[in-house]
Amino acid sequence: MFVALRDLRFARGRFILIGSVVALITILVGFLSGLTGGLATQNISAVLAIPGDRIVFSTPTNGTSTPSYSDSTVTEQQSKMWSAADGVASVEPIGVSQTRAEAGDARTAVAVFGVQPRFDDTAPTQDGSVSLSTPAAADLDVTVGDEIQIAGSTYTVETVAGEGWYSHTPVIEMTLGDWQGYSAATGA
């Protein structure tokens, strides 16, 4: 103890430097933790907001063992099978793809979710209309009632709400029927 106190007295600069480095490393770790948490949230916030307690994928056909939203296609027969399973209250299909949306001179990359009209509070109620997340509406500079284009088709903005992100792109919800037509036309 005596030697440590004597070292502190005679080498103050060294101990201040070491203490400063430890404090800066602690601050850096805190910043990096916040950054990774924010990036993770922006990557999957729309998926986390999906109402339900399970998500079902089809078996990958491309030889991989990991299912993904972009490769999974659940047939109507598979959907009916899951609906009949014990403990399942309901089954809702959802389509997920990535594309570009346009409104006037504004263009932005977006994630498009095809959902049933009763899927969530912000789901569009009819074909030809879309629900935009707040970031998507800001990027396209549109509000409720404006029109946007996705893959050459025009849609009316019915709702602007939420902070949905998927794969670091803002989310647009459209009806499942519109999404299936868009998906078939673009191969998405």
Predicted regions and their residues:
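Short glycine/proline-enriched coil/turn segments at helix->beta-strand junctions
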Residues: 1, 50-53, 87, 106-108, ...
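N-terminal Sec/SRP start-transfer signal
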Residues: 1-29, 40
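Charged, alpha-helix-enriched surfaces in structured cytosolic catalytic cores
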Residues: 3, 34, 38, 174
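Short, acidic/polar N-cap/turn motifs at the starts of alpha helices
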Residues: 5, 44, 145-147
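Hydrophobic, regular-secondary-structure patches
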Residues: 27-108
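Basic-flanked hydrophobic alpha-helices used for secretion and membrane insertion
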Residues: 102, 110-188
